[in-house]
Amino acid sequence: MSWDVFIQDLPPDARSVKDIPDEFHPRSLGRRDDVVGRIRTVFPDADFSDPTWGRLQKEGYSVDISVGDGEDVNGVTLHVRGSDEAVGAVISLIDAIGGRGVDSWTGELFDQAIALHSIRRWRAYLEEI
């Protein structure tokens, strides 16, 4: 299991997932090579030996990065595991990739102010199951 964050080109004026119109279709985040290149600007050691699936392994946390198998990337999913330090990596990845994130734990737009609380709730849930 992982704490997942979905990144897409979401409307900049949306304050909540509820603010995204049903008919909204996100634009591409770019060509896969360009998206991977932007990721590598902040994490040059990200392993993209599989061009559709990257892996960032750091002491205390890891992030699997799904960019899909199409040439155009419509969304990126971050599968996050580990310590609180992972939140900083998620913030850096969202900034580098572009677009906005949706926090799978809250079901809302990624919010730096509550991201630590979100990953901690996810870890607490793991301890319960």
Report the location of each language-model feature:
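Acidic (Asp/Glu-rich) sequence patches and key acidic residues
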Residues: 1-129
